[in-house]
Amino acid sequence: MAHHATELFIQCVYSLELSYHELLEKEAALKPAVTRILEEAGGEFIHFEEMGDTMRIQCVLPEYGEELFHPLLEGIARLMDGQVECRVLFVHKDLGFLHIAAVSRGVWQESCLHLPAPGPLTRALRDQDPPSR
């Protein structure tokens, strides 16, 4: 059985200046390019969902870490030409970390959020009586 440590979500947003025909052309070019980048990073179960002037992409990755994310972000950044930009979310499946990146015009910026591990605080919250209504 395959082990996938990371869930990846990408939201691509197209420029409002693109005509409908231009948007469809851009989308048709992005899908195989993004698929190649994700597959090179070990991505599986790649799913695209078109939603008007946005496209959502989801897949799973075998590992979790900057050594995987940074080359992936570099590849995606090369596709962002000002007519499309995206936001990327890497979620480690143990929910210990979230990596978030904004990608536009060939560059990317990231942030990492460390979530607290289950411990005294979360146990205390879990064991509290439910709030009264």
Task: Give residue spans per PLM region.
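Charged interaction segments
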Residues: 33-133
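Short, extreme N-terminal segment that most often corresponds to the first beta-strand
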Residues: 1-33
